[in-house]
From Swiss-Prot:
Coiled coil: none annotated. Residues 119-146 have a biased composition (Polar residues). Residues 1-48, 77-250, 276-338, 383-407 are annotated as: Disordered. This is Putative uncharacterized protein DDB_G0274535. Transmembrane segments: none annotated. Residues 1-47, 79-103, 151-182, 192-250, 298-314 have a biased composition (Low complexity).
């Protein structure tokens, strides 16, 4: 009996020692996890300067927002069925390689209810009120990817010096103790120093950018780095950046177009309908230039001249259409007045002698008038004559004009027009009044003529 009791005590002591060892192992693991968390926190503080995507600063892990979804609808990552609340509880115990980079991990995304303001609820209680959301318009460049690679290499060196600890993504949870349950409810066995996780060691790509994150695996106590995947995917990242830029430009153009249509009130895509003809002409010219790139400059000039001639012909046709429309055999215009064919450029103050003055003049007077006009023209426009002779001729002409009273008063008035137009117009109006008064028909004669016309 005493031997059995001693054996039992020894077994109990051994079990206690084993438990103590396990506890020590767990404590060591917790210490290592805490160290890793501190390292990750430092990396996060360094890498928060450049944020290539929309991120939410929530704890350690930056995760994208999905706006407009309820909590009941949960978006899960690949090969992972854990809920959001469990992930929130397990974030403190998990080691995160992706925290060193600004690229969000392909883990679960946070969802929340849309904040709809009501009468009893303030607008400041929206979901975005308690979270710091940063928006970046620019897409990350190659410089950011190189910095990310450098930080990943530094972190890998730190992890390799930490007694071959297990490093995994947010979706993997591993413990060194045998048959210990994780917070996620998953068990993991260690056989021959190899880790058998439910999730694969390779990281799943992001939602749309096809980026691969660096990861560490422990095989027989040795750390294996996979940073070469990031180097291979730099080209893909550049292509995705170009596609993102094109998409952003298209989105901005569509927004501007919609806002302009709203301001215009039409809402149609064809804003300027009157410019369609001009656009067609421009397209035709571009096609002609493309088809005739090898043609000579002379042919192009000839084509341009032909186009100008055609345009002028069209303009002439339009001008003819815009002319006065005649009615009733061409005798009347739109104003119902008699058409008067007056050439442009004719000025009204030109001295036109009345028919009465012309009829009263004798042939001798007309000849004398012509001679005087010729003398005036010769004295003004000839340069061979001395100035003294010119003045003498002018004086003689003036004296002859004033002395010869046989010439009718119309010639005097016509010459006077070029000096004082107002007096000339007054004289012309007086002559017209005299003519009208002399040729007036009495009312009795007018009545007789009108009576005869009716008969």
């Amino acid at each position: 009996m005493t031997e059995n009791n001693n054996n039992n005590n020894n077994n109990n002591n051994n079990n206690n020692n084993n438990n103590n060892n396990n506890n020590n192992n767990n404590n060591n693991n917790n210490n290592n996890n805490n160290n890793n968390n501190n390292i990750n926190n430092n990396n996060n503080s360094n890498n928060q300067i450049q944020q290539p995507q929309l991120q939410v600063n929530e704890g350690i892990n930056p995760k994208p927002l999905v706006i407009g979804l309820n909590k009941s609808f949960q978006v899960n990552g690949e090969n992972n069925t854990t809920s959001i609340n469990n992930n929130n509880n397990n974030n403190n115990n998990n080691n995160n390689n992706n925290s060193s980079s600004n690229i969000p991990a392909p883990s679960n995304t946070f969802t929340f209810k849309a904040g709809i303001p009501s009468s009893g609820r303030q607008r400041t209680l929206s979901p975005l009120g308690s979270k710091n959301v940063t928006f970046s318009t620019n897409v990350e460049n190659q410089s950011t990817t190189t910095k990310i690679d450098e930080t990943i290499n530094n972190n890998n060196n730190i992890y390799s010096n930490s007694n071959n600890n297990n490093n995994s993504n947010n979706s993997t949870n591993s413990n060194n103790s045998n048959n210990n349950d994780d917070n996620n409810g998953r068990t993991e066995n260690i056989e021959n120093n190899t880790i058998q996780d439910s999730n694969s060691n390779s990281n799943s790509n992001d939602n749309e950018n096809n980026r691969s994150n660096s990861f560490n695996t422990t095989v027989n106590g040795n750390n294996v780095n996979s940073n070469h995947i990031n180097n291979n995917n730099n080209h893909n990242n550049n292509n995705n950046n170009n596609n993102n830029n094109n998409n952003n430009n298209n989105i901005v153009y569509n927004i501007q177009k919609q806002s302009f249509n709203k301001l215009n009130g039409s809402g149609s895509s064809e804003i300027f309908q009157f410019d369609e003809e001009c656009e067609e002409e421009l397209e035709e010219q571009q096609k002609q230039n493309e088809n005739k790139t090898g043609s000579s400059a002379e042919e192009q000039q000839q084509q341009q001249q032909k186009q100008k001639q055609q345009q002028q012909q069209q303009e002439d046709v339009d001008d003819e259409d815009d002319q006065i429309i005649t009615v009733e055999g061409g005798n009347r215009s739109r104003s119902n007045g008699l058409m008067q064919e007056l050439k442009l450029g004719t000025s009204l103050p030109v001295g036109i002698p009345s028919r009465l003055s012309q009829s009263l003049q004798t042939p001798s007077q007309i000849q004398q008038q012509k001679k005087q006009e010729q003398q005036l023209a010769s004295s003004i426009f000839t340069s061979n004559i001395n100035p003294s002779t010119q003045t003498n001729n002018n004086n003689n002409n003036n004296n002859s004009n004033y002395s010869n009273r046989n010439i009718s008063s119309t010639t005097y008035n016509e010459r006077k027009k070029y000096v004082t137009p107002r007096d000339s117009w007054v004289d012309i109006l007086k002559e017209k009044e005299e003519m009208e008064s002399s040729f007036e028909i009495s009312q009795s004669l007018k009545r007789k003529q009108s009576y005869k016309s009716y008969i």
